[in-house]
Amino acid sequence: FIQSFDSDMLKYLRHELKTRIKLVQLLGENRWRLSDTDFSYLKTEEGMKEVSEYADGIGPWMNQLVTGVDFSGKAQITDLLKIARNNDLWIHPYTFRVDRLPSYTSSFDELLDLFFQEVGVDGIFTDHPDQAVRYLEQNSSN
C-alpha cells in the first residue's frame, strides 16, 4: 500500500504512472493544513466517488468514523463509513495507540473490538502492531 494525504499525488500515481500498487487516501481535517487536499469535500458522497476513481481505500482519522458511544455502549458511527462502503473503498483508520485511547474505551483490545467488530473496518494504522496482531489472531474467525 501507498498512503498519502495528498490527493494530487495519488491521482498522479494511478493515472499518470499507472501504478497497480494499492493506494489509500488518508483523510485529515482542513485545519491541520497537511496538503492542499480539501478533506471536507472528500468526505462527501461526491468527494468519495472521486476518491474511488484513483484509490483503493481511505485512511480516516478514527474520530472521523466514530464520535463516541451512546449510553448503551454502542458506537456512534458517522456517515463516512457508509459513504466509503457505497464506493467500494477499504477503510483503514489511524492511528491506534495503546497510550492514547479515546475517552470511550478503556483498553486497546476494547478499541480494536469496537472498530473491527462493530464498525467493520478492513484494517488499521497502529504504532503497536504486536498487540494488534495478537488481538487479530485471538479474534480471528478462521
Q: Locations of the language-model features?
A:
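Catalytic cores of phosphodiester-bond hydrolases, prominently lipid phosphodiesterases
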Residues: F1-N142
